[in-house]
């Protein structure tokens, strides 16, 4: 029985990934598009309450792809890397992967060091969430306290409210 050959005919396939990208858009535009598009699609899946196994895998892959595309952008900042690692940590926490969540949360804190209290507070939120997944009550309490310390220093009411809500949801998980 012959097998199915799913390869493109040579006449249809680009000779390189660069040729494929440059045929329609340039690389910078592609990275710009996919860094945001993949982040937003991952975020949609984070918010979804009943994800399938496939959607969980897609959520992780989209976040990883987004972060990689950010690293390829000439305008990538430490804030972008902080946000990307925060999202990745959140996803690993949702998937119950404590060690991966912690690694990404530590990267988030690293990239947040010289940014605003909002980003540092969220890095500690990610560290607290990963500690919760690891059942590390001491680490969770420490990073919740740190996040609250930075929360008090956030000047924007809207940003402060967003972090406050995430901290309360995390604190509520212990009470549930």
Predicted regions and their residues:
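"A position-specific structural signal for the A-helix of alpha-solenoid helical repeats
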Residues: 40, 87, 126, 163-170
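Residue register of alpha-helical TPR repeats
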Residues: 36-37, 81-83, 122, 162
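Amphipathic alpha-helical segments of tetratricopeptide repeats
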Residues: 64-71, 106-113, 146-156
């Amino acid at each position: 029985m012959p097998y199915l050959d799913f390869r493109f005919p040579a006449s249809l396939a680009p000779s390189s990934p660069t040729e494929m990208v440059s045929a329609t858009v340039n690389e910078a535009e592609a990275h710009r598009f996919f860094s945001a598009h993949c982040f937003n699609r991952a975020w949609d899946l984070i918010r979804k309450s009943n994800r399938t196994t496939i959607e969980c895998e897609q959520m992780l892959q989209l976040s990883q792809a987004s972060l990689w595309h950010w690293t390829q952008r000439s305008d990538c900042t430490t804030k972008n890397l902080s946000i990307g690692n925060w999202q990745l940590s959140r996803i690993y926490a949702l998937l119950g992967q404590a060690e991966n969540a912690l690694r990404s949360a530590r990267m988030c804190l690293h990239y947040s060091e010289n940014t605003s209290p909002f980003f540092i507070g969220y890095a500690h939120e990610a560290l607290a969430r990963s500690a919760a997944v690891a059942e590390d009550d001491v680490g969770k309490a420490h990073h919740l306290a740190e996040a609250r310390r930075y929360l008090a220093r956030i000047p924007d009411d809207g940003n402060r409210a967003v972090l406050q809500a995430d901290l309360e949801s995390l604190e509520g998980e212990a009470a549930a």
